[in-house]
């Protein structure tokens, strides 16, 4: 799960905060 969060954070840096929220829900 930790690795997945890291990937979501990287995507968020590109401008996709929705992915971060989705990652937390998937966790």
Curated annotation (Swiss-Prot):
Protein name (record): Ganodermin
Domain of life: Eukaryota
Originating species: Ganoderma lucidum (Ling zhi medicinal fungus)
Function, in words: Has antifungal activity against B.cinera, F.oxysporum and P.piricola with IC(50) values of 15.2 uM, 12.4 uM and 18.1 uM, respectively. Lacks hemagglutinating activity towards rabbit erythrocytes. Lacks deoxyribonuclease, ribonuclease and protease inhibitory activities.
GO biological process, one term: defense response to fungus
Alphabetized UniProt keyword annotations: Antimicrobial, Fungicide
